[in-house]
Regions:
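N-terminal alpha-helical targeting/anchoring segments
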Residues: 1-120, 138
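TRNA-recognition modules of translation machinery and tRNA-sensing kinases, especially anticodon-binding
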Residues: 115-412
Length: 412
């Protein structure tokens, strides 16, 4: 509908897609479909004529029908091939980003929207989370690596209790906001990954189980979009609000050397994901984007962690995002803020891929809009908590909001 805008989106998002080729292929598919329809119409007409034709004419019609069958077979094969190519290109077609997105090739072009809270000042030399956790016997990296290889870990004792507390806090926060709690499958089929946009672009990031034609999902979002694939929802059921809880798995291909120490970048983690399906209205989607972002900020403020909200650039947000805000939380050992949350608005990009639709008040069937944001992901947030709230005795002060989940304990 707007090829120039799509070309601009392809350019600023760094997508490897020739829009002119896509348009040519679309015209070719439409033309081939017309040819198929016309050939089928001639075939039906020939069949009707055959019943009332004389013997000589029937012989002619048999020959014509045989020729038509050959033509139809060739046309259908051409149409199938062209349609498959077109679908492949359509899967690469990006959402046009919102006008406020910084234009740039990657996260180096991201801009800080606001900084909330103040990083702690220590009157002693603080430990990084690996040193502290190993000193307290709260993590075992070496034995975990024997079992599962690099970036494996085993949370132990009070650290596991802290993880449970953080997730309970996040889930209770979302219950209060009328989100439906869902424990989703982590084993998913390929169409679910295509529907959310993980495939084909990020196939290398995904663990595969070829024997069963299954994959390990990197986020609950995959299952939550898939729940409503090929459905038509009633407008009265919108917005759909889910708090998806699941183990998540990511290969982290190409991340060697980037914050890989300890618990910061691992292959398996637990996450509570906020997910919304709303009506196809940009203003409503924007309101939900602000709501999801605000909930994540509320959680971090409750925990007492300093953070920054970042406006993600066109090159960082990925093909499907209309808008993306990361939240980066202060990590004392790095002397920097690191990503703990990512809030995304995708308009109808996922809904079109997955077939998530709704019937509007006037009876019109439309593709819905989808949004998502992390509520909390562990173990990365645990690294932030133990580093920010450590004492000189290598204890950890428990944020007040978590104390009810830990039997009232103020120190770990």
């Amino acid at each position: 509908e707007n090829p120039d805008a799509v070309k601009a989106a392809v350019r600023v998002k760094g997508i490897d897609l020739d829009v002119d080729e896509l348009l040519d292929l679309d015209r070719s598919v439409r033309s081939l479909q017309t040819d198929v329809d016309q050939a089928q119409a001639r075939r039906r007409s020939s069949s009707k004529e055959f019943a009332r034709a004389d013997e000589a004419r029937q012989a002619e019609l048999r020959a014509e029908s045989a020729e038509l069958d050959i033509q139809l077979k060739a046309l259908r094969e051409q149409l199938a091939e062209a349609t498959e190519k077109l679908q492949g290109l359509l899967l690469l077609t990006p959402t046009i980003p919102w006008e406020g997105a910084p234009v740039g090739p990657d996260d180096s072009a991201n801009t800080v929207v606001r900084t909330v809270g103040t990083p702690p000042e220590f009157g002693f030399t603080p430990l990084d989370h690996v040193e502290l956790l190993e000193k307290r016997g709260w993590v075992d990296f070496n034995r975990a690596r024997k079992v599962a290889g690099e970036r494996a870990y085993a949370l132990m004792s009070d650290l596991l209790m802290l993880e449970r507390a953080v997730h309970s806090y996040a889930l209770d926060l979302l219950i209060a906001k009328d989100f439906t709690l869902v424990s989703v499958p982590s084993l998913v089929r390929e169409p679910a990954l295509v529907g959310t946009g993980q495939f084909p672009a990020h196939r290398e990031e995904t663990y595969a189980i070829p024997a069963d034609d299954l994959y390990l999902a990197g986020t609950a979002e995959v299952s939550l979009v898939g729940f409503h694939s090929d459905e038509i929802l009633d407008h009265k059921s919108l917005p759909v609000r889910y708090a998806g809880f699941s183990p998540c798995f990511r290969r982290e291909a190409g991340s060697a050397g980037r914050d890989v120490r300890g618990l910061l970048r691992v292959h398996q983690f637990e996450k509570v994901e906020q997910f919304v399906i709303c009506a196809a209205d940009v203003a409503e989607s924007d309101r939900w984007h602000a709501e999801l972002l605000g909930t994540a900020e509320q959680l971090l403020q409750g925990l007492g962690l300093a953070y920054q909200v970042v406006e993600c650039s066109t090159g960082d947000m990925g093909a499907g995002k209309y808008r993306m805000n990361d939240i980066n939380t202060w990590m004392p050992s790095l002397g920097a803020y690191r990503e703990t949350h990512s809030c995304s608005s995708l308009l109808d990009w996922q809904a079109r891929r997955a077939g998530v639709r709704y019937r509007d008040t006037d009876g019109t069937v439309r593709f819905a809009y989808t949004l998502n944001n992390t509520a909390v992901a562990t173990p990365r947030i645990l690294a932030a908590l133990v580093e920010n709230f450590q004492t000189s005795e290598a204890q950890v002060r428990v944020p007040a909001v978590l104390q009810p989940y830990l039997g009232g304990r103020e120190l770990l």
